[in-house]
Amino acid sequence: MDSGKYWERVLRCSKNMSLSRVRRTFSIMGRDEDSSDNDLAAFYYPALQAADIFELEVDIAFGGMDQRKAHMYMREVAEKNQWTKPTCIHTPMLSGLKGPGGRMDSFDHKMSKSDPENAILLDDDSESIRTKIRKSFLDVGNDKSPIFEISQHVIMPKLGKVVVSPDPKYGKPSEWTDQQQFVDAVSNGEIHPLDAKMAVADALFEVLEPISQHFSDKQDLIESINSISGKS
């Protein structure tokens, strides 16, 4: 931050907030309220995050559902200090590709860029997406499995259907416009899990292809981002 007022802002974000109130924000770090009593840094984080939003003069704070409690904390801070309160928009969380889906209020298995093989990155090309999805976890009886979550929250709203195209030796192509019927078809064996994965992979790339194309000739930018994030 270039602003010499930043740390003053952090202190103002901390003032008049109790420890119990700060604990209620800990889902932003994938922790429960009682897990950070031996980690003082955890209590700093909500104030730092709130200060960032104010210093950047953000009008709309956008994040996953795991950010909701921290954003509500930020809005309380704004009200106490008579600062502008940003609007907050929160999206569903997608489970990481390697593990089973969890409840919406549990973020232990969320997709995260900190593990690129466990997540779909916006600049992934078609082959990367297919490889990651092929290796991903699919519990056929669990509609919260990562593959089903991607279908529900990304593909169905954007494309309106999942197109399954198995090897002709094993079946005929099929289209699914209803999420639950798609899940049921995989669960009862009508669709082979691998065919379901590849259908989701192809549909996901169709959604993300414009972004992938945008970054295809900006390798210097990608390398700069990777150098900051530590991605090789």
Language-model features, listed with the residues they occupy:
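Divalent-metal (Mg2+/Mn2+/Ca2+)-assisted nucleotide/phosphate chemistry catalytic cores
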Residues: M1-H90
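Conserved nucleotide- and phosphate/pyrophosphate-binding catalytic cores
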Residues: A50, R68-S232
